[in-house]
């Protein structure tokens, strides 16, 4: 799938390759018999490429995708990068307030406080100011109905009593004679920034406006909001500037249901909201605010909700949601514009949000978003009601937009258990729709650390903000330092002029940096040789002295000396050049730590990361990065926390060995491994190598076991693994072993990372360590690709936004396997990799509904095409009249409820199937606003139908406050019918066929239909379903439960006992025969969790993972929390079938 495939291909993943069992790491270290300069043989030759090309005929859809993708390419390297941050701040927006309540939180004082803070920090003068303008009525009509706009316009002429009467017909709003004009001005302010941004007048922007807008719906005021500014801006950008894909990020503490309802059928707008939910107890009390609501119809998968179910959520929780969910999906969606509903009511001290985020945290969120859409980013103020916190939050985000480094986070950057659960559930709901979210075999085995210890760690690591920290923002004259010396070209191969590690490497890089004007933007720093004392921090004195003797050796002796090492050549200048390269890195460290520059690049050679304490290796003599790290710690006078990221395609064995017992240095390497056959050979680069002694867990190896790894694979590793660990480590300095031999065209690497990809990797790391980051050149042997790649990284260091990644394919399955393998290894060391606790997983994973997506339209869906009502809205219909549904909440495992929802959804999930039904999706959305509806509870109580729907464009179904004992139970599975009322569902004529009256209600209340563990307890008549709904084969395929095709715990299955298998045995503990399971390790029989839960107790005591149902012969893995169907289970299943039915199983698949 290409990056532009959102407009022409289905969002449902086309194929799900079964992940293979990862090979066991070899315990023996392979001898390094191969040479580093050997060319990998896995790449196809020219003849194969030509043959393959002739066999592939470009289809029309693929050609259209290619054309759209090429539109994003910039073939002119000297194109001017837009500069400046736009700001709209108009005093007229303070011309309204609540006439009857002076204490109303949405007040003019909010903007006054912001303005004072921006003046205090000198930010107003650094921005490009734009005059606010009024939005035209035609522009508002891109989202809102004309009748609603006209109604709002009449408020200009109402007196206070009339305004109050009208305001009371809505939820949480007030009206003032100037409310309409200010709302128009607020919307127009955002549109002005859109024009400036798309016209390359600015790089990004912020609209400091009021009233807020994200709760406003098509024809409904709500939650202080009259017009939905960002929704109008998205439609405006699509119409005027031909933007095809817009990302809207809503980090306001309240769910922006208005924005969600406007776009929940539209695949051209991706909506992401992270908000306080508390299982529906927090405003706006909607099921549509939960993780299970993902949009419907063509927009299924394009609505993302991350609900916080407790207060006090911190920066770490928000950052984790961005890393694990938003950034991966956005990288596949590839937005062309990012709009942020920037509410700051999640900051510590806000009376409404009751969260514990800090201004620095919002600076980091802003920075992460600046890597998307080529940097085209607009923040629009929404909520925030603690004046001091609001002002600090706005200023922090504005600092980041202006290019200032993100402050270091003071709290422990580890998400809490509740956040991990919410993130996991959201991922579960979204995984079928986004290829980048596909998780390979990522087992959820219990960590070796006891659960009690983990909980104690969380308690000890808990952080509670007592006050907003006074963030400091460094003012630097020079942002990026550059160190280079042509003397390093003196190191050369006297016997082979075509050796890949050629002196031309650094010369070509410098020439390119000068050609594109980047060198002139940097502060040129003089290189110096490393001192012996600096070298001795990482290398032995004997080795240094031995290398020094090569300066006076004869040519024949130099050749013999080089042969003593692995992949090494030596000339008389080698020792001096190696000292100069290492000293240059140390000089750059001095400049960064002293504040002379913020970050820097060292264009040096020979490279260093293979150099061992006592030996040269792989073109390397002195380990420049390692020496620079030790030099930084000496300057600081303490064990400075240093992150070393090594993205050279070869594993940095030398760096790993130097720091493998040091917890002050986190070493992360991404490299080709090919199961130990890629240089430097052996098992040092395996994922199982995690360090030793005090440094255990601080060595992280991401081994690629094949070629062609590209941008998508590296970004997946960044999002899932590198950045979560890095944020938890919270480094004070970042050093990058910047080898570019994983770049496209490199003769040694065989990978496909683009210069743009390296720019993104650099940008994402720049949020760490207060922006103190240094790139030190390692490998890279294609002169063109290393020059362009280093230039791309330099652009990022200078603050230029990373370019869009065009034609980005999904991550390779082999890459996902490697990443998952590393995550499994390091979960015990890094809490940020434990997405959720085991006992919470069942909430999300049981009976997950999967519906094939419709092919999205190539153009955005207009508001009129979706939900525009006909006729004027009567005044009494404006009032929100939502009533909680009667009946119980549907639990996750209820087979009848889930199957019925699946079948009902089946009739509505495709345009072809919809032809035979009287249900209109647009009408249904007008009625319930896209909220989730429990159809079974509705069908069971038809007398309540009139009270279960809302007025036109109402908020949707409210979430009733659950009893205390049920606060952790949530409804699952967003159906495509998330806007259908119970009354309208009767139009399908199927409920009568299923006879779902009191019988359905009884089935709903019983636990016999639960699919959690014992599918054998299900008593649903599938034939009745078939008769009621026709042949499913003619419609979209759906699955109530999809078993795993492989499980890492299959090795726990033991041979069938000699006495055979008796599935009629009673439970060993209680003697029941009602519903039992047999353990496939010890073959003892116990009852299910829905009888007396003795099999659950057996699993907890024995840790035996796999069990077989004596009822329906299904196999369940307690550790994976999923059903498993694999050929290794066929023998035991067949034996059980023979015992139960007296014959072999009818089929073996």
Swiss-Prot record:
It is an enzyme of class 3 (hydrolase). Keywords: Actin-binding, Autophagy, Cell projection, Chromatin regulator, Cytoplasm, Cytoskeleton, Hydrolase, Metal-binding, Methylation, Nucleus, Phosphoprotein, Repeat, Repressor, Transcription, Transcription regulation, Transferase, Ubl conjugation, Ubl conjugation pathway, Zinc, Zinc-finger. Zn(2+) 2 binds at residues 1067, 1070, 1087, 1094. It is found in: Cytoplasm; Cytoplasm, Cytoskeleton; Nucleus; Perikaryon. CDD domains: HDAC6-dom2 (cd10003). The gene is Hdac6. This is Protein deacetylase HDAC6. Expressed in neurons of the cortex. Expressed in Purkinje cells. Detected in keratinocytes (at protein level). Residues 87-403 are annotated as: Histone deacetylase 1. GO terms for cellular component: aggresome; axon; axon cytoplasm; caveola; cell leading edge; centrosome; ciliary basal body; cytoplasm. Phosphorylated by AURKA; phosphorylation increases HDAC6-mediated deacetylation of alpha-tubulin and subsequent disassembly of cilia. Ubiquitinated. Its polyubiquitination however does not lead to its degradation. Histone deacetylase domain 1 mediates the E3 ubiquitin-protein ligase activity.
């Amino acid at each position: 799938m290409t990056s532009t495939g959102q407009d022409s291909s289905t969002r449902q993943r086309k194929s799900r390759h079964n992940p293979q069992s990862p090979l066991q790491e070899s315990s023996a270290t392979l001898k390094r018999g191969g040479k580093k300069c050997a060319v990998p043989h896995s790449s196809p030759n020219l003849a194969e490429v030509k043959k393959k090309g002739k066999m592939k005929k470009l289809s029309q859809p693929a050609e259209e995708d290619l054309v759209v993708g090429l539109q994003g390419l910039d073939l002119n390297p000297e194109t001017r990068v837009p500069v400046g941050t736009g700001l709209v701040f108009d005093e007229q927006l303070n011309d309204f307030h609540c006439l009857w309540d002076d204490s109303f939180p949405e007040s003019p004082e909010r903007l006054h406080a912001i303005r004072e803070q921006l003046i205090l920090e000198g930010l107003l003068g650094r921005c490009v100011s734009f005059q606010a303008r009024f939005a035209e009525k035609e522009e508002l009509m891109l989202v809102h109905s004309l009748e609603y706009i006209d109604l709002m316009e009449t408020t200009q002429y109402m007196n206070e009593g009339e305004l109050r009467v009208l305001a009371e017909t809505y939820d949480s709003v007030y009206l003032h004679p100037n409310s309409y004009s200010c709302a128009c001005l607020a919307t127009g302010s955002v549109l002005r920034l859109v024009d400036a941004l798309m016209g390359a007048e600015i790089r990004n922007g912020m609209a400091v406006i009021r009233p807020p807008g994200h709760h406003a719906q098509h024809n409904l005021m709500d939650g202080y909001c009259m017009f939905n500014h960002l929704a109008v801006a998205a439609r405006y950008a699509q119409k005027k500037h031909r933007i095809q894909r817009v990302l809207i990020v809503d980090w306001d503490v309240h769910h922006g249901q208005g924005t969600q309802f406007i776009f929940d059928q539209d695949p051209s707008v991706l909506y992401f909201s992270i908000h306080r939910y508390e299982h529906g107890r927090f405003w706006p009390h909607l099921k549509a605010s939960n993780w299970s609501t993902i949009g419907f119809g063509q927009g299924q998968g394009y609505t993302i909700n991350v609900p916080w179910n407790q207060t006090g959520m911190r920066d770490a929780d928000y950052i984790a949601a961005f890393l694990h969910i938003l950034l991966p999906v956005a990288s596949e969606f590839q937005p062309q514009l990012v709009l942020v509903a920037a509410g700051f009511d999640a900051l510590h001290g806000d009376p409404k949000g009751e969260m514990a985020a800090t201004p620095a945290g919002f600076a980091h969120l802003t920075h992460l978003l600046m890597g998307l859409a080529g940097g085209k980013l607009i923040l629009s103020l929404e909520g925030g009601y603690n004046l001091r916190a609001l002002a600090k939050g706005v200023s922090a985000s504005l600092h980041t937009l202006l290019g200032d480094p993100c402050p270091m986070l003071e709290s422990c950057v580890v998400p809490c258990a509740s956040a991990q659960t919410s993130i996991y559930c959201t991922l579960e709901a979204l995984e079928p729709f986004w290829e980048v979210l596909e998780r390979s075999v990522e087992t959820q085995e219990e960590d070796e650390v006891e659960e009690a210890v983990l909980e104690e760690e969380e308690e000890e690591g808990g952080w509670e903000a007592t006050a907003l920290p006074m963030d400091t923002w460094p003012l630097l004259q020079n942002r990026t330092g550059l160190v280079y010396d042509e003397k390093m070209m003196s190191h050369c191969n006297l016997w082979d002029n075509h050796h890949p590690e050629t002196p031309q490497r650094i010369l070509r890089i410098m020439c390119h940096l000068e050609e594109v004007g980047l060198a002139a933007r940097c502060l040129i720093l003089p290189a110096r040789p490393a001192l012996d004392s600096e070298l001795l921090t990482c290398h032995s004195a004997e080795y240094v002295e031995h290398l020094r003797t090569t300066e006076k050796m004869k040519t024949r002796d130099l050749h013999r000396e080089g042969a003593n090492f692995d992949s090494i050549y030596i000339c008389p200048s080698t020792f001096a050049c190696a000292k100069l390269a290492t000293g240059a890195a140390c000089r750059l460290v001095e400049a960064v730590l002293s504040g002379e520059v913020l970050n820097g690049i060292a264009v040096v050679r020979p490279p260093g990361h293979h150099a061992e304490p006592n030996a040269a290796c792989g073109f390397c003599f002195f380990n420049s990065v390692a020496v620079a790290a030790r030099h930084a710690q000496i300057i600081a006078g303490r064990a400075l926390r240093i992150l070393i990221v090594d993205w050279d395609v070869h594993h940095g064995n030398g760096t790993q060995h130097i720091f493998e017992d040091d917890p002050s240095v986190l070493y992360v390497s991404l490299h080709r491994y090919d199961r130990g056959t890629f240089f430097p050979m052996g098992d040092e680069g395996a994922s199982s190598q995690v360090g030793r002694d005090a440094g255990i867990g601080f060595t992280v190896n991401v081994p690629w076991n094949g070629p062609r790894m590209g941008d998508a694979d590296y970004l997946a590793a960044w999002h899932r693994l590198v950045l979560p660990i890095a944020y938890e480590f919270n480094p004070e300095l970042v050093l990058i072993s910047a080898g570019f031999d994983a770049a496209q065209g490199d003769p040694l690497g065989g990978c496909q990372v683009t210069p743009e990809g390296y720019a993104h990797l650099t940008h994402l790391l720049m949020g760490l360590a207060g922006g103190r980051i240094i790139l030190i050149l390692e490998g890279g042997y294609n002169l063109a690709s290393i020059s362009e790649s280093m230039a791309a990284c330099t652009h990022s260091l200078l603050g230029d936004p990373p370019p869009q990644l065009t034609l980005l394919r999904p991550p390779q399955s082999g890459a996902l396997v490697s990443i998952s393998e590393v995550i499994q290894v390091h979960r015990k060391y890094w809490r940020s990799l434990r997405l959720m606790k085991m006992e919470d997983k069942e909430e999300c994973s049981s009976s997950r509904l999967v519906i094939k997506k419709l092919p999205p339209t190539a153009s955005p869906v207009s508001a009129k095409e979706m939900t525009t009502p006909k006729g004027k809205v009567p005044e009494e219909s404006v009032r929100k009249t939502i009533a909680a549904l009667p009946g119980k909440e549907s639990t996750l495992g209820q087979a009848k409820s889930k199957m019925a929802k699946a079948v009902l959804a089946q009739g509505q999930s495709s345009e072809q199937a919809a032809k035979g039904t009287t249900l209109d999706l647009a009408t249904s959305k007008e009625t319930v606003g896209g909220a989730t509806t429990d159809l079974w509870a509705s069908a069971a109580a038809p007398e309540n139908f009139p009270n279960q729907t809302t007025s036109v464009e109402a908020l949707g179904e409210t979430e009733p406050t659950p009893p205390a004992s049920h606060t952790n139970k949530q409804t699952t599975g967003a159906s495509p019918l998330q806007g259908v009322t119970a009354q309208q569902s009767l139009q399908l004529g199927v409920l009568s066929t299923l006879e779902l009256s009191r019988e359905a209600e009884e089935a709903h209340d019983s636990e016999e239909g639960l699919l959690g563990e014992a599918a054998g307890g299900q008593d649903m008549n599938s034939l009745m379903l078939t008769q009621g709904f026709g042949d499913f084969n003619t419609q979209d395929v759906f699955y109530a439960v999809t078993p795993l095709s492989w499980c890492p715990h299959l090795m726990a299955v033991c041979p069938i006992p000699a006495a055979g298998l008796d599935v009629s045995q009673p439970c060993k503990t209680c003697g029941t025969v009602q519903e039992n399971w047999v353990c496939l390790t010890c073959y003892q029989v116990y009852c299910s969790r829905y009888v007396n839960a003795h099999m659950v107790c057996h699993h907890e005591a024995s840790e035996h993972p796999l069990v077989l149902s004596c009822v329906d012969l299904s196999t369940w893995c307690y550790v994976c929390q999923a059903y498993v169907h694999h050929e290794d289970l066929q023998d035991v299943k067949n034996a059980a079938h023979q015992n139960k039915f007296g014959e072999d199983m009818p089929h073996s698949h």
